[in-house]
A protein has these predicted regions:
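The feature marks the mature, well-folded catalytic cores of soluble enzymes
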Residues: 1-173
Length: 173
């Protein structure tokens, strides 16, 4: 924090007190993205994660960026029976240059929500199932892969289906 400020980077710090009951609030990338003048809100599986979408933070962003468009169209999936989710850039690993979204499908990343988001953002979805060393689903894609401008890091062995693994690796090549 201090190092960034020393470099002249403006930081707006929002604290999450115990009263907020949001222990995972240090991961705001799961409930929103900010890109091209749009604040996109994502449906979250756990109720305490939904509490992170604080109105004071959203209002601050709207005040700071008067032309900001708030897109909450995906939040309706939280209210469906059964509910469906897509936890932001925890679930979505986006290659912005190639316009591809890699998504490990899980209880926190439902294919229907992925398809709608990708269509709206002009992204090609590449979905797959990923498992940890004990055979449990990996719930956020960003724990098993990352895509940067000139390099990608992926734990290919976690992609359960060999055909899916090949599809992901080919897309990254």
């Amino acid at each position: 924090y201090r190092g960034l400020r020393a470099l002249g980077i403006e930081i707006n710090l929002f604290t999450h007190d115990e009263k907020h009951a949001t222990p995972d609030a240090c991961f705001p990338n799961n409930w929103h993205t900010l890109r091209d003048g749009k604040l996109k809100l994502f449906p979250m599986k756990d109720e305490n994660r939904r509490l992170e979408r604080r109105e004071d933070i959203i209002e601050f962003l709207k005040h700071k960026h008067p032309n900001l468009v708030v897109d909450d169209s995906l939040l309706r999936y939280e209210r469906q029976d059964p509910p469906k989710f897509l936890e932001g850039t925890g679930s979505l690993v986006v290659d912005h240059e190639e316009r591809v979204a890699y998504v490990a499908l899980s209880e926190r990343a439902h294919e229907e929500v992925v398809a709608e988001h990708c269509a709206a953002e002009n992204l090609t979805p590449i979905t797959f199932k990923a498992l940890d060393a004990r055979g449990r689903p990996i719930y956020h894609t960003n724990v098993m892969m990352s895509v940067c401008s000139s390099v990608a890091i992926v734990c290919a062995d976690s992609i359960a289906d060999p055909a899916d693994r090949r599809r992901v690796l080919d897309a990254l090549a």
